[in-house]
């Protein structure tokens, strides 16, 4: 198999790791929501989150494909009402995250500082099967597979800005007006 083309490239190739998978036999809509939920998370936090989803301690919030999705209290954590626990999609994405961490170790990057910056799920070609119906008819049985690509980049730890020592305390305009009147 040849080189995989990604839809986006990381800004710093030396500090980034990539992984992808094609023609996965998991539901496109569920996998889309799983990847959307882990985007922007630290690699270790994403793994911990997905393991909690498998244990049904936390849910995947459904934001785009919300038709006939049940409501759960676990989705309130994300400001949503609808959520699910798509175990098969979560296990596939966990495998890709394990691949990311193995790639990071091969590049000798610190996995604790890796942040998932890009995740994309595309529809794959429909898998065609058939089912036999009454009176000699045949109907299609299609499955909606997907392609997934993810990359993570090592991010330096944020340094907090020190507050200036002699900075005057800012007073809001409403407070200034009350002080001027003498109330």
From Swiss-Prot:
GO annotations of cellular component type: cytosolic large ribosomal subunit
PANTHER family under this entry?
60S RIBOSOMAL PROTEIN L17 (PTHR11593:SF10)
Q: What is this protein called?
A: Large ribosomal subunit protein uL22
A Pfam family this protein belongs to? Ribosomal_L22
Tell me the GO BP annotations in alphabetical order: cytoplasmic translation
Q: Which organism is it from?
A: Tetrahymena thermophila (strain SB210)
Provide the alphabetized UniProt keywords.
Ribonucleoprotein, Ribosomal protein
Molecular function in Gene Ontology: structural constituent of ribosome
Keyword Repeat: yes or no? no
Family designation: Belongs to the universal ribosomal protein uL22 family.
Upper classification of the organism: Eukaryota, Sar, Alveolata, Ciliophora, Intramacronucleata
């Amino acid at each position: 198999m040849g080189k995989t083309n990604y839809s986006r490239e990381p800004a710093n190739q030396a500090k980034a790791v990539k992984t992808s998978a094609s023609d996965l036999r998991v539901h496109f809509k569920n996998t889309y929501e799983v990847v959307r939920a882990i985007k922007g998370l630290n690699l270790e936090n994403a793994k911990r989150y997905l393991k909690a989803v498998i244990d049904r301690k936390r849910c995947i919030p459904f934001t785009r494909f919300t038709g006939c999705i049940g409501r759960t209290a676990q989705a309130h954590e994300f400001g949503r009402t609808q959520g699910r626990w798509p175990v098969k999609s979560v296990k596939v994405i966990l495998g890709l995250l394990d691949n990311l961490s193995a790639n990071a170790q091969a590049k000798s990057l610190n996995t604790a500082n890796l942040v998932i910056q890009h995740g994309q799920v595309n529809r794959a070609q429909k898998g065609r099967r058939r089912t036999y119906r009454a009176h000699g008819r045949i109907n299609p049985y299609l499955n909606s597979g997907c392609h997934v690509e993810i990359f993570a980049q090592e991010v330096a730890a944020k340094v907090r800005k020190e507050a200036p020592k002699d900075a005057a305390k800012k007073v809001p305009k409403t407070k200034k007006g009350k002080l001027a009147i003498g109330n």
